[in-house]
């Protein structure tokens, strides 16, 4: 595949994409079309925390495919794997946090967290850490500290601020509405 096709037909989400053509992955490595291995510190934006092509993950996916691929993540249908996962998670949480909101991406989880924070507190302001990545939706961009990625999409969500970590003076940004 030509790099020119990549830049011509696929939207870029960062100013300087790596543009490595990946042919396959195994364990903690991704490989380019010349079979050069790279240690994968991105891990599918944390989706591959067990590594690529882990045998137990492959087996679980194949077993599930024999039943059904996907019906819905929003709690409309009883799906045994989802119920088992949420039950397992609840064993490690306080009684007041026994329910789990399942999503299909980290960005969607961030959007859910933003809504939950506003709903649970009744407050409008959101404080986030500078230099944190949360995704590419409007809500996620609003609490991301990378101005270079945010600029083209303004105006973003109102009442959001990004503060520096480990800087006590930044705590002044917290108000009664945070």
Provide a role label for each language-model segment.
Residues 1-26, 81-82, 175:
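Active-site-adjacent loop/helix segments that line or gate small-molecule/cofactor pockets in enzymes
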């Amino acid at each position: 595949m030509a790099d020119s096709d990549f830049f011509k037909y696929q939207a870029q989400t960062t100013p300087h994409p790596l543009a490595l053509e990946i042919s396959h992955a195994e364990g903690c490595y991704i490989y380019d079309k010349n079979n050069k291995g790279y240690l994968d510190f991105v891990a599918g934006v944390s989706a591959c925390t067990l590594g690529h092509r882990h045998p137990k993950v492959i087996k679980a996916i194949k077993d599930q495919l024999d039943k059904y691929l996907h019906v819905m993540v929003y709690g409309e249908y009883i799906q045994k794997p989802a119920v088992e996962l949420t039950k397992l998670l609840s064993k490690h949480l306080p009684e007041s946090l026994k329910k789990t909101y399942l999503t299909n991406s980290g960005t969607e989880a961030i959007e859910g967290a933003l809504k939950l924070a506003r709903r649970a507190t009744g407050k409008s302001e959101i404080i986030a850490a500078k230099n944190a990545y949360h995704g590419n939706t409007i809500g996620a961009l609003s609490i991301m500290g990378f101005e270079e990625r945010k600029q083209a999409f303004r105006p973003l969500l109102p009442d959001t601020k990004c503060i520096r970590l480990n800087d006590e003076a930044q705590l002044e940004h917290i108000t009664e509405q945070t």
